[in-house]
Curated annotation (Swiss-Prot):
InterPro entries: Ribosomal_Su5_D2-typ_SF, Ribosomal_uS9, Ribosomal_uS9_bac/plastid, Ribosomal_uS9_CS, Ribsml_uS5_D2-typ_fold_subgr. GO terms for biological process: translation. The lineage of its organism: Bacteria, Bacillati, Actinomycetota, Actinomycetes, Mycobacteriales. The keyword Oxidoreductase does not apply. It comes from the Bacteria. This is Small ribosomal subunit protein uS9. Residues 121-152 are annotated as: Disordered. PANTHER family: RIBOSOMAL PROTEIN S9, SMALL RIBOSOMAL SUBUNIT PROTEIN US9M. One of its GO terms (cellular component) is small ribosomal subunit. Belongs to the universal ribosomal protein uS9 family.
């Protein structure tokens, strides 16, 4: 009662590795938000150039902390010299815009190379920071600051 099934040789196609620079036919576009800032990011294969509202990274963000914050996702996945970044930033201040740009870059890197997702997720670059300014309440001077209290 033993039946023999014919064994079929299956040719395995070469697996596609994403470690080489991922080629895409058009720019990757993503959006990053933080506080009141909204940033639209375009990721293009290139040499690591930043174009933020027509200015360089150093001109737009003179603060080295903000520059480091923005480059962090690219450094994490070791693609600092692989892509050019064109971004339109509006709303908020420097800190909010830097955070929004970081989120937009991280989201674009995932679209470009899905294998980078675990590293970026672990580093916390894919989480939208929900903190925003608390509204002022009536009867108070600011969001939580009460007027001076006098016992007598």
């Amino acid at each position: 009662m033993t039946e023999t099934t014919p064994e079929v040789e299956v040719a395995v196609e070469a697996e596609v590795t994403y470690s080489e620079s991922f080629v895409f036919e058009r720019p990757i576009q993503t959006v990053g938000r933080r506080k009141e800032a909204v940033v639209r990011v375009r990721l293009v294969p290139g040499s690591g150039k930043f174009d933020l509202n027509g200015r360089s990274l150093e001109a737009y963000f003179p603060n080295k902390v903000h520059q480091q914050l923005i480059k962090a996702p690219l450094v994490t996945v070791d693609r600092l010299e692989s892509y050019d970044i064109f971004a339109l930033l509006h709303g908020g201040g420097p800190s909010g815009q830097a955070g929004a740009l970081r989120l937009g870059i991280a989201r674009a890197l995932i679209v470009a190379n899905p294998e980078d997702r675990p590293a970026l997720k672990k580093a916390g670059f894919l989480t939208r920071d929900p903190r925003a300014t608390e509204r002022k309440k009536y009867g108070l001077k600011k969001a939580r600051k009460a007027p001076q209290y006098s016992k007598r």
